[in-house]
Design a protein with these regions (language model features):
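Short, acidic/polar
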Residues: 167-177, 229-234, 304-310, 374-379
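Alpha-helix-loop-beta-strand connector modules within alpha/beta enzyme cores
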Residues: 133-137, 151-152, 157, 197-225, ...
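N-terminal small/glycine-rich loop or linker at the start of catalytic domains
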Residues: 62-72, 139-163, 282-294, 359-360
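Active-site mouth loops of central-metabolism enzymes
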Residues: 155-170, 293-302, 364-373
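Hydrophobic faces of well-ordered beta-strands that scaffold small-molecule active sites
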Residues: 153-162, 185-189, 216-224, 241-245, ...
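Conserved small/polar residues in nucleotide/adenosyl-binding loops
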Residues: 387-394
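Glycine-rich, proline-tolerant flexible connector loops at the mouths of alpha/beta enzymes
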Residues: 111-116, 123, 127, 187-204, ...
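Long, compositionally biased, glycine/small-hydrophobic-enriched stretches that function as flexible linkers
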Residues: 1-139
Length: 399
């Protein structure tokens, strides 16, 4: 495995695979904050050249967090179909990119089970924005809860009827307004102010009563912590179509969210037994580049690789929805509209390549160098790449 290259008479050397991956990443303020980004455009190109010549086997053997230390790494590596992996392991990342851009959906789907997160992230780093849109457009992933999402030519949305005090009347007023706009076919999902069993149960029942009365084909969900939702199920307090949890790409970062793989395995088993939905896909996850660094759990890896690891974590539970909340942390991780757009396209592509039903909450914080035009640009590019789900009323500002 070669870790150096020469460009314009200067030799660029890299410590290891993790260093190559970090420096080959497109410019992100989060990687700069972590002190792992390329110091110049030329160094970034050099890292991409080295990465293009690495094999998928090199990446499999060098996860950014060691297998022995991390439950997300173990979940990712243990899920690999070894027979499929053996067929593709000799491909270089550059050759893998060419395959993805030239192959059809059937051929790409056939090799998904042989991939790891590092492979998925690596090939995304070699792609232009147009490559990401073109490749993602070919990938089809469907999922069914009460309804089915991911079919060609469709776009699903989440209705988020948040309320400052979780007042039921205020929440339901927002639900009715959103439904009148045709929003909410992916899920009616509230971010609760009060994370208690009683409050979560009451809201779930309100949503389900409304859905039944008006025969609304969708799913109900309250985005409380997974342990709160588990208690609701254990006590049979309310119908729950979808179970939610935010995910991170490492065991350390997951700990900051109050979860680990073992807990999520338990939650999945409980939900499978007691869910009120009818289909085989009943988990809902949210992610976003930068979470691991903010939780001091990035292990010196770049935020794109860590995000790809979230998708391997999510895939373990056959989710109905996975949603990257692009730009939600702020300029410390995605500085401006250009970085936000790039991250949204990367995440969408990586999620679909991983094999999960990928959506995007197209948003930005008020102190980012971004505006509504940037959001609309990203939304248009995502729909051009046949993204199947967007968050909220499609576009929003996080204050």
């Amino acid at each position: 495995m070669k870790l150096k290259t020469t460009l314009f008479g200067q030799t660029y050397s890299f410590r290891d695979v993790k260093d190559v991956l970090a420096k080959a990443n497109e410019e992100k303020s989060g990687d700069m904050l972590a002190g792992i980004a390329a110091q110049s455009t030329v160094e970034r190109v050099a890292a991409k050249a080295v990465l293009a010549d690495m094999t998928l086997e090199d990446l499999r053997k060098n996860p950014v967090v060691p297998y022995e230390e991390d439950d997300v790494t173990r979940a990712d590596q243990d899920a690999v179909n070894e027979a499929v992996y053996d067929q593709i392991k000799s491909l270089t990342v550059g050759e893998f990119r060419e395959f993805l851009l030239s192959a059809n959906d059937f051929d790409i789907a056939a090799i998904r089970s042989g991939l790891t997160s590092e492979m998925v992230a690596a090939v995304a780093k070699l792609m232009t924005n147009m490559d990401l849109v073109y490749a993602a457009k070919k990938l089809h992933v469907e999922a069914t809860c009460n309804t089915t999402i991911g079919r060609p030519g469709t776009l699903s949305t989440r209705l988020q009827p948040n309320h400052a005090t979780d007042d039921p009347e205020g929440i339901m007023a927002s639900v009715m307004e959103g439904i009148s706009y045709g929003i909410g076919d992916a899920v009616i999902g509230l971010n609760p102010v009060v994370d208690t069993i009683g409050s979560v149960s009451d809201i779930l029942k309100e949503f389900k009563t409304f859905m039944n009365k008006w025969q609304i084909p969708t799913q109900n969900c309250v985005l409380a912590h997974v342990t709160t939702q588990m208690k609701v199920l254990e006590q049979n307090l309310a119908p729950m179509d979808l179970m939610f949890q935010s995910l991170a790409g490492s065991e350390v970062a997951s700990r900051a969210f109050g979860i680990n793989v073992a807990l999520m395995d338990e939650a999945y088993a409980l939900m499978k037994e007691r869910k009120s939905s009818t289909g085989p896909n009943f988990m809902y996850f949210e992610t976003g580049q930068g979470s691991e660094l903010s939780a001091d759990g990035n292990h010196g890896a770049d935020q794109l690789v860590m995000e790809a690891r979230c998708y391997a974590f999510a895939k373990r539970y056959h989710p109905f929805l996975v949603n990257t909340v692009v730009g939600f942390i702020g300029p410390e991780y995605l500085y401006d509209g250009r970085q936000m757009i790039r991250a949204g396209l990367e995440d969408h592509f990586m999620g679909k390549l991983t094999g999960i039903p990928m959506g995007c909450d197209v948003c930005y914080t008020n102190h980012m160098r971004a505006d509504q035009n940037d959001l609309e640009n990203l939304a248009m590019m995502l729909t051009r790449s046949e993204e199947r789900r967007v968050g909220k009323e499609c576009l929003r500002l996080c204050r």
